[in-house]
């Protein structure tokens, strides 16, 4: 029985599979259906994310994983800042029946120290987050989709009738 968080974390890490950042880079190149998930909080993601990663804060991972990857045998790689939260997340996903989950040892900090490429996605401002809240909660749109809409050029012709706020959300 774990007597401290450190003991508990050691116990968790002993029960999951961890890979190095170099292993992850190799997996990204070779494993066609690999899903990489960043479990950090949005403000942490502003410092850069691993290319192609899905951004799902740890607090929402278990709720959203079936939408992201319904196949419980598909390969998943989880990372956070240092590898601790991703290890805990890997344990939780294993308990949900996901059988091919790895945690990236050292997290994005180790990725950055290794000189591997990070993406710096454009994020919504606080005002935009409030304005587009109704769209961003939809899994089909989310923050990524809303950011794409903001970057797009849109022409609205004859949409809706008088008083119809069709273009309000664009």
Which residues does each PLM region occupy?
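Conserved beta-strand elements of the Class I
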Residues: 35-37, 77, 155
């Amino acid at each position: 029985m774990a007597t401290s968080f450190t003991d508990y974390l050691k116990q968790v890490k002993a029960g999951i599979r961890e890979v190095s950042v170099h292993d992850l880079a190799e997996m990204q190149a070779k494993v066609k259906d690999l899903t990489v998930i960043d479990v950090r909080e949005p403000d942490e993601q502003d410092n850069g994310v691993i290319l192609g990663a899905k951004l799902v804060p740890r607090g929402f991972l278990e709720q959203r994983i079936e939408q992201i990857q319904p196949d419980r045998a598909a390969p998943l790689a989880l990372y956070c800042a240092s590898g601790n939260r991703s290890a805990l997340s890997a344990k939780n996903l294993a308990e949900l029946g996901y059988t091919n989950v790895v945690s990236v040892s050292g997290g994005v900090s180790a990725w950055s120290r290794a000189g591997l490429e990070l993406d710096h996605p454009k994020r919504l401002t606080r005002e935009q987050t409030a304005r587009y809240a109704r769209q961003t909660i939809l899994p089909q749109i989310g923050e990524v989709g809303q950011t794409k809409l903001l970057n797009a050029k849109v022409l609205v012709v004859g949409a809706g009738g008088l008083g119809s706020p069709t273009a309000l959300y664009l």
